[in-house]
Amino acid sequence: MKLWFPYFLAIVFLHALGLALLFMANNASFYAAASMAYMLGAKHAFDADHIACIDNTIRKLTQQGKNAYGVGFYFSMGHSSVVILMTIISAFAIAWAKEHTPMLEEIGGVVGTLVSGLFLLIIGLLNAIILIDLLKIFKKSHSNESLSRQQNEEIERLLTSRGLLNRFFKPLFNFVSKSWHIYPVGFLFGLGFDTASEIALLALSSSAIKVSVVGMLSLPILFAAGMSLFDTLDGAFMLKAYDWAFKTPLRKIYYNISITALSVFIALFIGLIELFQVISEKLHLKFENRLLSTLQSLEFTDLGYYLVGLFVIAFLGSFFLWKIKFSKLES
C-alpha cells in the first residue's frame, strides 16, 4: 500500500484543486461543463489505447522485475498535460475568434462531437475484430484444454494491436524501463485526434459560458483528475490481475477477452450516443419511444456513473464466471 500512496495522494490533490477552482469561479451554469470534463477524462481510462498501453508497459516492467506501480499515473499525467496546455490556448483563441465568427461556437460544438463520436466508433469496430479473433482462439483452447505455441504468439500479436495509437507508438515501449518513462508516451497519446476534439469541446464550453480564467482552468484539471484516478486504478488492478491471470495461458486469454470486450462496448456505446444526440438535436427530432427519448436527453454526468457501475459489475461477473465455468480446465 505504501508504494501506491504517493500516486493516490497526488490524485486527491488534483480533485481538490479542480473543485476549488470550480467553486471559486462561482458560476452554477458551469457545473455541467465541469462534470463533462471529468467524465471525458474518466472515459479515457477505458479506451483501448490506454488499456493496451498500460497493460503492455506493466507486463514489460514486471517481467523485468522492476517497479510498475506508477505506470497508470504517469501515463495519464502525460496525456493530461496536452489537454491542460491546449485547452487554455484554445479557450483564449476561441474567445478572440468568436468576435469575428459568431457561428464558431455552434459549428465547433457540432464538429467536435461528430469527430469524437466517429473516432470512437472506428476504434470500437477495430477492436471488435480483435475481440472476435481472441474468442476464436479461446474456443479452440477451451476444447483442446491447452494453448499451442502458435496460439500464444497469435494472442500476443492481437493484444499489442489493440488501439489505433498503441499500434503507431509501439516502438517507443522499447525505451521504457521505469514507470515515469511512460510520461512522454502519454503526452504523445494526448496529441491524438479524439483528444483534439475533446479539447475543442472544453474550450468552447468555457468560452460559451464566459467563465473566469479560474473557472476555465478547472476544466482541464478535472479532466486530469478523472483520467489519473481511473488510469491509476487500472494499473493497480492490472498488477493484481497479472499475478492471477498470467499463471496459466487460459487465464491470460480470458482476462484479455474481458478487458477488450469492455473497451469495445464503451467506445461503441459512447460514440453512438454522441452521434445520436447531435444529429437528433440538429434535426429537431422528438421521440415517443421511451428508450430513444431517454438516450436523447441522457446527461454525460449520469452516463459516467452508469459506466463506472457497469465496469465494476462486469469485472466481478467475469471473475465469478471463470471460477464457476472455466477454472476446472486448469486442473
Curated annotation (Swiss-Prot):
It is a multi-pass membrane protein. Disulfide bonds: none annotated. Belongs to the NiCoT transporter (TC 2.A.52) family. One of its GO terms (molecular function) is nickel cation transmembrane transporter activity. InterPro entries: Ni/Co_transpt, Ni/Co_transpt_high_affinity. Keywords: Cell inner membrane, Cell membrane, Membrane, Nickel, Transmembrane, Transmembrane helix, Transport. One of its GO terms (cellular component) is plasma membrane. The chain crosses the membrane at residues 3-23, 77-97, 110-130, 184-204, 213-233, 259-279, 302-322. Its main location: membrane. It comes from the Bacteria. High-affinity nickel intake protein. Imports nickel ions in an energy-dependent fashion. Necessary for the expression of catalytically active urease. It is found in: Cell inner membrane. It comes from Helicobacter pylori (strain J99 / ATCC 700824) (Campylobacter pylori J99). Pfam families: NicO. This is High-affinity nickel-transport protein NixA.
